[in-house]
Design a protein with these regions (language model features):
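Conserved SAM/AdoMet-binding glycine-rich loop
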Residues: 110-115, 124, 227-350
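Proteins enriched for Cys/Gly/acidic motifs involved in redox and nucleic-acid/cofactor modification
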Residues: 1-243, 282, 297, 319-330, ...
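Contiguous mid-protein beta-loop-alpha structural module that forms a pocket-lining wall or clamp
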Residues: 348, 364-365
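Conserved, mostly hydrophobic/aromatic
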Residues: 198, 218, 235, 271, ...
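Short flexible coil/turn linkers enriched for glycine and charged/polar residues
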Residues: 181-184, 194-196, 293, 303, ...
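Radical SAM enzyme [4Fe-4S]-AdoMet core and its adjacent flexible, acidic
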Residues: 49, 244-265, 312-315, 373-406
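Hydrophobic C-terminal alpha-helix "anchor/cap" residues
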Residues: 63, 129-130, 260, 287, ...
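Terminal RNA-binding accessory module
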Residues: 2, 383-478
Length: 478
């Protein structure tokens, strides 16, 4: 970065170009800090999924490189909202926060506000921001996050709102600065976008088509993370099971997993999300063979009715899903299975719901995220007739939640008294004498410890099951 001189012609290489603008922004920030006699602060707020959380770490990396000091206070000199648009109420939440920020900006003329992420990919949203929230300084989407420094520089040199939204891209820019939330674990993007177009989901329209990173770049990033103290990585993609299909030399996710498993010093590998339609026998075998892969699979069901699954455009039926579960359990008997289930999808009947309930009873999920269907403007499902009666949907939701919780409690209780490996993750927020960690199966454990234990693995006896978490103690002679 030090080799990028501001007197040079702006580089055309994507990475060098952004490093150039980082240096330029750095000069502007240093000058303003000198005038104000204090450091400039920045605050990033993330709405939505782990992909967004990882993007926010990149945004924060650029901001801190430029010279901003991170704070959680929205009174900061620079506030950026990385938005989600999976549900329409997520949009309303952002509009509400912007109204809150407008008062801060009136008091601080140097304050800048930026909006990015999935919500900004909707033209109606951008138009509303342009007309009703003119105090916003910078608006960009999901495809050009790597250009953040350049866009910020443009705003620093201009008095008007900067808007830069791309419909799609095939570009992936490596090696930009990043500021991780945790020192010992990290998300790693292996791909971007989604090609699945489930009828209820807006993601493919705002995240674009699938594009995979080169395996060598992923391996190099993880090796660098491990050298920096990371012991657990989460491989991220909207559908990791379709990784590598669009590469010049195609690579499967199973092959990538085996390569990541070879990295010395890495202790744990997680991944999400897995679409059942692309879950191969070879991936199941790789999970069985790779000792660092955690014993946890998040496998969204969405519905147990083959009829509803077809309308959802999920590309599998109930029998195919149950076959995958059977194969997973045969290969990895102690694997924890979690899922997502939607209740009240348009046209869902009592019979359809009972099929979902039957699958839940048959699979016995360790836990499940259950949702009442939320109409999402811009998706095929939103225009479907035969929307369900809200009272009936609520009744079904309550029945499903009760069943899920009973099964989860039974599954959790089966581990009480066992000694298992736990990654210590943080000091307990309610009791400072306890450390909170996670099992390989993603269950939470609280046990006596000190902050210096964070980021390390311990054998812990699960002394008491509390339903959704365990109390434990360091095992003797472990």
């Amino acid at each position: 970065m030090g080799n990028i001189a501001l007197t040079d012609v702006i580089p055309q290489d994507s990475l060098e170009r952004q490093l150039y603008f980082i240096e330029k922004c750095k000069a502007y920030v240093a000058d303003l800090q000198k005038k104000l006699g204090r450091p400039l602060t920045c605050c990033t707020q993330t709405f939505g999924c782990q992909m967004n959380a990882r993007d926010s770490e990149k945004l924060l990396g650029i901001l801190t490189d430029i010279g901003y000091v991170e704070t959680e206070d929205e009174h900061a000199d620079f506030v950026i909202y990385n938005t989600c648009t999976v549900r329409e109420n997520a949009n309303n939440k952002v509009y509400g926060r912007l109204g809150y920020l407008s008062n801060f900006k009136k008091k601080n003329p140097h304050m800048m506000i930026a909006l990015c992420g999935c919500m900004m990919q909707e033209p109606t949203v951008v138009e509303k921001i342009r007309k009703s929230y003119r105090f916003v300084d910078l608006v960009f989407g999901t495809h050009n996050i790597y250009k953040f420094a350049e866009l910020l520089c443009n705003r620093m040199e201009s008095d008007s709102m900067i808007i830069d939204i791309w419909k799609d891209t095939d570009k992936i820019v490596e090696d930009l600065p990043i500021r991780r939330k945790f020192s010992f674990k990290s998300g790693v993007n292996i791909m971007f976008g989604c090609n699945n177009f489930c009828s209820y989901c807006i993601v493919p329209y705002v995240r674009g088509r699938e594009r995979s990173r080169e395996p060598k770049d992923i391996i190099r990033e993880i090796e660098g993370l491990v050298a920096d103290g990371v012991c657990e990585v989460m491989l991220l993609g909207q559908n990791v099971n379709s990784y590598g299909k669009n590469l010049e030399q195609p690579v499967t996710f199973a092959e990538l997993l085996r390569e990541v498993n070879k990295i010395e010093g890495l202790k744990r590998i997680r991944f999400m999300t897995s679409h059942p339609k692309d879950l191969s026998d070879d991936l199941i075998l790789a999970m069985k063979e790779c000792d660092k892969v955690c014993k946890h699979m998040h496998l969204p069901l969405q519905s147990g009715s083959s009829r509803i699954l077809k309308i959802m455009n999920r590309h599998y039926d109930k029998e195919q899903y149950l076959t995958i579960v059977k194969k997973l359990r045969e290969a990895i008997p102690d694997i924890a299975l979690t899922t997502d289930i939607i209740v009240g999808f348009p046209g869902e009947t009592e019979e359809d719901f009972q099929e979902t309930l039957e699958v839940v009873k048959q699979v016995e999920y360790d836990s499940a995220f259950t949702f009442i269907y939320s109409k999402r403007t811009g998706t095929p499902a939103a225009a479907m007739e035969d929307q369900c009666d809200p009272a009936e949907v609520k009744r079904h939701f309550d029945l499903l939640l009760k069943e899920v919780q009973q099964i989860s409690a039974k599954k959790a209780m089966a581990l009480e008294g066992k000694v298992m490996e736990v990654l210590a993750e943080e000091q307990n927020t309610q009791d400072a004498s306890l450390i909170t960690g996670r099992l390989s199966n993603n269950s939470v454990v609280h046990f006596p410890g000190t902050p210096d234990m964070i980021g390390k693995l311990f054998m812990v006896k699960l002394t008491e099951c509390k339903g959704f978490y365990y109390l434990g103690e360091i095992a003797e002679n472990a």
